[in-house]
């Protein structure tokens, strides 16, 4: 509500989803209640958790969920839940806006709908802190004829190859490289 986002544009939720009989129903109930304020539509939003692939990664759990969500938006596909056989019987998915991502789900291409494709990512900390962010697909950029030049510098045992994306980036990269080489002669630079 505060961000002015229509919840029906959220097509995927990367849940904290640790696979517990108590925790998962509570999380899905919270998601259902949040959507219910804005839509009565059922089963339009896939829900998954990368923990089915890796288990709980403790402090990195939220970060890996964020990475999965970003890749899902980029690839326009939601990967299926690994090792998923049947839903938790304590979760009434048929009455919820979410459904388990039990199969590869296409998100569609930009422009197919008037709305921007979004996803949510939830992460719960051991101290009781809950975090939820909403991400959206990157805007479609116009293609240009600009092709970056490959910048090469060969000095003794040093090789730097940089493929800038824009003319501005080319200029800034060159300034940075010259400055860095002057400050750290003989060191290898990674960037």
Predicted regions and their residues:
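Condensing-enzyme catalytic core of the thiolase-fold
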Residues: 1-143, 153, 189
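Flexible, low-complexity linker/boundary loops enriched in proline and small hydrophobic residues
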Residues: 121, 134-191
């Amino acid at each position: 509500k505060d961000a002015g986002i229509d919840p029906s544009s959220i097509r995927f939720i990367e849940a904290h989803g640790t696979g517990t009989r108590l925790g998962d129903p509570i999380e899905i109930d919270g998601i259902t209640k949040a959507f219910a304020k804005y839509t009565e539509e059922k089963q339009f939003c896939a829900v998954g958790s990368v923990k089915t692939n890796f288990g709980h990664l403790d402090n990195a759990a939220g970060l890996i969920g964020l990475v999965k969500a970003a890749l899902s938006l980029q690839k326009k596909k939601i990967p299926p839940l690994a090792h998923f056989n049947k839903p938790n019987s304590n979760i009434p998915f048929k009455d919820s806006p979410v459904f388990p991502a039990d199969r590869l789900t296409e998100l569609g291409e930009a422009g197919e709908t008037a709305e921007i494709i979004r996803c949510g990512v939830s992460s719960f900390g051991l101290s009781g802190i809950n975090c939820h962010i909403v991400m959206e697909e990157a805007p479609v950029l116009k293609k240009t004829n600009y092709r970056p030049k490959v910048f090469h510098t060969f000095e003794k045992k040093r090789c730097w190859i940089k493929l800038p994306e824009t003319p501005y980036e080319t200029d800034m990269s060159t300034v940075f490289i010259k400055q860095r080489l002057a400050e750290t002669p003989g060191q290898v630079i990674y960037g």
